[in-house]
C-alpha cells in the first residue's frame, strides 16, 4: 500500500517557458521506453509495484501517445509530459538532465498548453522531489488517495 497525492494548480505563477515541445513520434519509441522505465524504476521498486519496468513491450504505445509531448535536443529526449484533458501526467526528465531546471520548464509548458480552469496531477507520496517541484510552481495537495496496488490492480483486470 502507498499514498498518492492529488494536487491542483491553485496559485498561478508568472513564470513562462521558452522551450518547444513536439508531439510524440514513433522514431523516439525505444529511447522513450528506456528513459520512462529508468525514471520510474526506483519508485516502483521501493513501492513494490510490478513490473518494475512498466513499459514491457510495444503495446504501451498503442493508446494515449497522441497526448505525449517531448522536449528534444538534437535527436535526444531531454524530457516529456502527457496531457490528458486537464491533467498533467508522466512528467519525466532524462536522468542525465535532471536537476538542471528542465522539469520546471516542462511543467510550465504543460500549464501553458492545458486549456482548462482546473489543472490537476497525481504524484506518489514517495516522490518528494516531484512534490517539491509542483509546490514551488503553484500546486497544492487537495486529496490523498491510498493505493493497495495488488488489490486495486486485480480489481481493474
Model-identified regions with their sequence ranges:
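Conserved GNAT-fold acetyl-CoA-binding loop/helix
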Residues: 37-59
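Conserved acetyl-CoA pyrophosphate-binding loop and the N-cap/start of the following alpha-helix
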Residues: 97, 101-109
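Acyl-donor-binding surface of acyltransferase catalytic domains
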Residues: 1-18
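A short beta-loop-alpha structural element at the N-terminal edge
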Residues: 20-34
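Conserved beta-strand-loop-alpha-helix junction that forms the acyl-donor binding cleft
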Residues: 121-131, 147-156
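A short helix-loop-beta-strand connector motif used in the catalytic cores of GNAT acetyltransferases and
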Residues: 58-70, 87
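Conserved active-site alpha-helix within GNAT-family acetyltransferase domains
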Residues: 1, 104, 126-144
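Conserved beta-strand in the GNAT
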Residues: 70, 75-92
Amino acid at each position: 500500500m502507498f499514498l498518492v497525492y492529488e494536487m491542483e494548480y491553485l496559485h498561478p505563477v508568472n513564470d513562462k517557458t521558452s522551450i518547444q515541445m513536439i508531439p510524440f513520434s514513433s522514431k523516439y519509441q525505444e529511447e522513450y521506453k528506456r528513459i520512462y522505465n529508468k525514471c520510474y524504476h526506483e519508485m516502483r521498486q521501493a513501492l513494490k509495484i510490478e513490473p518494475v519496468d512498466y513499459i514491457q513491450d510495444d503495446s504501451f504505445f498503442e493508446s494515449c501517445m497522441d497526448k505525449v509531448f517531448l522536449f528534444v535536443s538534437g535527436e535526444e529526449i531531454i524530457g516529456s509530459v502527457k496531457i490528458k484533458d486537464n491533467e498533467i501526467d508522466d512528467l519525466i526528465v532524462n536522468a542525465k538532465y535532471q536537476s538542471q531546471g528542465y522539469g520546471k520548464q516542462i511543467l510550465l509548458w504543460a500549464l501553458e498548453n492545458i486549456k482548462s480552469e482546473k489543472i490537476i496531477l497525481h504524484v506518489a507520496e514517495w516522490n518528494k522531489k516531484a512534490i517539491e517541484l509542483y509546490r514551488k510552481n503553484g500546486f497544492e495537495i487537495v486529496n490523498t488517495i491510498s493505493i493497495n496496488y495488488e488489490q486495486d490492480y486485480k480489481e481493474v483486470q
